[in-house]
């Protein structure tokens, strides 16, 4: 099996734009509400919920922590809805995404999300399941429920993608 090393990139709105939204206050539209006592950072992610009897779910995932090296042997995507991951413990995590190439993930990229950043994967975006760093961490997840199966998985058969370090290049 061929091993390809992935290089970690900083998570920025511009770099992540083809895959979804970076959820953070930096650069967001600020609105004062509640008689000026609360700052609202407005419209941070494009939440999608399509299909029969579709609705938005809010869950908490508790992710086990990973240490390098991390082998990426599969990816997943959600054809009927977006999926957002917002860290609740202020800890970093890795975000692995890929372009679609004829129904298969291709050209993988990995980003380091700081504990004050979340991500929202758009519908049909290939991504790896949660990769918490440092220690077990909780994440608020905004997801989609509905009649249709909203999970498609792909397992690599000829290449393992490896993250050698958890620090950006």
Curated annotation (Swiss-Prot):
Keywords: Lyase, Purine metabolism
Pathway: Nitrogen metabolism; (S)-allantoin degradation
InterPro entries: RmlC_Cupin_sf (IPR011051), UAH_cupin (IPR047233), Ureidogly_lyase (IPR007247), Ureidogly_lyase_bac (IPR023525), Ureidoglycolate_lyase_dom_sf (IPR024060)
Group of enzyme by EC: lyase
GO molecular function: ureidoglycolate hydrolase activity; ureidoglycolate lyase activity
Essential cofactor(s): Ni(2+)
UniProt superkingdom: Bacteria
Catalytic activity as recorded in UniProt: (S)-ureidoglycolate = urea + glyoxylate
Record Gene3D superfamilies: Ureidoglycolate hydrolase
CDD domains for this protein: cupin_UAH
GO biological process, alphabetically ordered: allantoin catabolic process; purine nucleobase catabolic process
E.C. number(s) listed in UniProt: 4.3.2.3
HAMAP family per record: Ureidogly_lyase
Record family assignment: Belongs to the ureidoglycolate lyase family.
Subunit structure of this chain's protein: Homodimer.
Job of this protein: Catalyzes the catabolism of the allantoin degradation intermediate (S)-ureidoglycolate, generating urea and glyoxylate. Involved in the utilization of allantoin as nitrogen source.
Protein's recorded name: Ureidoglycolate lyase
Organism in which the protein naturally occurs: Brucella anthropi (strain ATCC 49188 / DSM 6882 / CCUG 24695 / JCM 21032 / LMG 3331 / NBRC 15819 / NCTC 12168 / Alc 37) (Ochrobactrum anthropi)
